[in-house]
């Protein structure tokens, strides 16, 4: 069964963005033994000047609502709670996107 994952990344290679400050999410679909790039979604960051608004947070989560998980370099506690409420697993790991995808494909694990 295929599922989508969002990665908070400035360059499409490394998970290097804070969830609340990322300007884009790279969307990848995982299906059995294949990972497929879907698109890059532009995001208006929900954190500005060390705080966030509920509307902006809701907008960011809505942008990735078709994803089962999001990977970011950092994710605040409030965002983790809101993502969980939306049914989106959150993972805080500054890593290479390709390494995460390879691990998912080789272990044949789902995140859910």
Predicted regions and their residues:
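Mid-chain, well-packed structural core segment of small domains
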Residues: 53, 59-89
